Amino acid sequence: MDTFDSARESLEGYLRRIGCLNDRYRRGEIHVHVPAGLDEDAPIDDLVRRCLPDSARALDAASRSLFYSLPVAFDPAHSVGPYLATVDRDPEGEPYRFLDMGAMIATQAFGENDPRVVEALLRDLPYVTSRFAHSEYQTALSLRLKAALDRVAPKGTPRHFVVNTGAEAVENAIKAVLLNRVKTSGEASGGSIVSFEGAFHGRTLGSLAVTHRKKARLGFPTFDWPHVSFPAVDGTPRESARREERSLKQVWDLIASVRMPRAEQRRESFQRELEAIDGFLAAPGGDLDAFVRAQREALGEEPLRRARRVAAVLVEPIQGEGGVHFTSAGFMRRLRVLTRIYDVPLLFDEVQTGWGATGRLWAHEMFDLPAPPDAVIWAKKAQNGVLFVSEELATFFQEEKKFNTTWEGDSVGMVRLLAVLDRLDLDQVARTGEHARAGLEAFARDYAGLIHGVRGAGVMLGFDVVRGDWRDALRERAFRLGLVLLPAGERTLRFYPRYDTEPYVIDEAVGLLRRAIEDLIRGRNEPAVAAGPEIRVGTLECPIEAIEAVELTPARFAELESQIVAVEAERYGDASQYPPDVLRAGRRPLLQFPSAVLAGTLSNPGALGLALRDRVSGRVVAYALGSALEGHDEEGVSADPRLGENDTFYLHALATLPSIKNQVEVENLLLTRIRDQALAGSFSHLSTLIEERVHRTGPEWLRNAQVLQVVDDYLRSGIRFVYLHTEIDGAGAPVVVERRRTRR
């Protein structure tokens, strides 16, 4: 037998199979196919062992691997479009299939086993049988890719550097702007890089310095660089405008003084510059270079010299990992002019958004910037990492091989990208995105108590689930039904169809979402809105003088966890409060916080917690905990007028045993103690989403708190919650906000 006979036979079978699969997919004959038992109320790992045994064996064989997320083994050879086959087969020999609405973490523009990609890989097989070290050994393939990148390079950033991953591209962008400062301004350290809260730029050490995701950063020493608030478009236009101005002021403070002041600093100077920028942007056809020169002359040499200590501002056009958050075009235009005036490079991280995902070739094109960015970072759909830079930043790339990397990209990824680079159809992206968004908006309308905030551009879509633990539960239920979704931020689910996804596939995905959420609320009758759970006649005597307060540190919480969870369960998870079918095995109670959520809050910046314990019995009878407002994304937080000011304590969780006779008295003691704790922790304001009953029966300072939002039927529990805000230091003018009422 010829050496290649077996391979040739296998290849021919594969080509016949994918040809047939693609035909069936385009005819609408491929659908989700998962074992019926996968939806039983049992731990998912147990169900995988029972229903997907081949996947379980493959995972067991790789048990020393440090990380995997989805508990199945996929089979690329039998996958098609967004339908991912598993290695497991049904009794008829057909593979089980999951529907991927994560686009392989935003890496795939087109479907699995796309015929044109397969054809390209076969044609360029010689280039992928050996991996050339392109830093020294260029090939016709690597040079063909670099020539192709010239065609898609963003305006103003014609030079490019191919690396292996998005994080590596971010690292090289960081190095480029730091070296630029060292060489051009004599700033020995290279200065600092300003990034935004909610940002995610990678997990390598340098990229962690510009990432604002506590779980990714925790435990790693890195650069102490500043983060400013990201003015996500949310709430009223007035509120969005206030956030934008606050964020620009923070950037301006850093550029002008290289520190983040708590007090207002030279606000009149900032307002004067901002008014000048707005005036320029309002006049069509303005000469940006002339405007920048005039502003620099007015500023003088000293402010411009100080600004050199900021090496760059780095921003995502859309925060993907951070929660599919957008800001306005007006904010980005102002930011671009501000950074030009102070000669601070502006970098766009388009790792997720680049090459068509938003309906534009590059997402920053949505903003109609008065000047292009100084660098654009791309990866994901590039199948490698790519850094595009301006001619100015490219100056030092050849110096002493400071930017060298052995591989300069992976050949297989190069072939994949070249196969689809000229297939981008932005009209197709728009059509696919519009169909998906319409389906999600209808879904959100039908489940307005649980789902809201559908948003996106192109096929980069997301929606919020009312609480983070519900988001996780919904994602798991969807997975059991065969739908793969990826989380983002604190309570967002991403919905990323591929560019050429067939309409029937999107309809199927939305249908599975509907089934999944019905699983979470199945069996419930719509209850009448009540003021709160009925307070039962208590049997436990708990005199105030017999109560001791215990500060809840993470370690102390671990010691008292079982008692705290018992209080939470009796208050919000007991069958006397909810229909029994809601509490059957494998379901999460409607209002009860899982212990992992409570522990997570105590790991936040500014975390405070308190438990009240009966000295006689030693039993915890009440607890409360929370942290800085900026660490939360619950209902009402995004519209809080103090968000971004870093002076507000958010009371995240509070529960008192409903079985004690003097429940309200104990509750009020707890509320006052936690308020005092927050005041001692340098917080001047307190916000919380809390039962309306507690607002009515709480201590005077809470009864006088301003109601910012009324949430009827919270989590379809029949309980009315209110979002409260109050000043706790007794100083300052009252906050003026627009009161909202929603049915959640």
What are these regions (language model features)?
Residues 1-534:
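Conserved N-terminal phosphate-binding loop of PLP-dependent enzymes in the Aspartate aminotransferase
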Residues 530-574, 740-744:
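Conserved N-terminal entry element of GNAT/NAT acetyltransferase domains
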Residues 568-616, 625, 631:
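Active-site rim helix/loop that mediates acceptor-substrate recognition in acyltransferases
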Residues 615-653, 715:
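Conserved acyl-donor/pantetheine-binding loop and adjacent beta-alpha core of acyl/acetyltransferases
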Residues 653-656, 662-678:
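Conserved acetyl-CoA-binding loop-helix of GNAT-fold acetyltransferases
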Residues 678-693:
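Conserved GNAT acetyl-CoA-binding A-motif
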Residues 691-718:
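Conserved active-site alpha-helix within GNAT-family acetyltransferase domains
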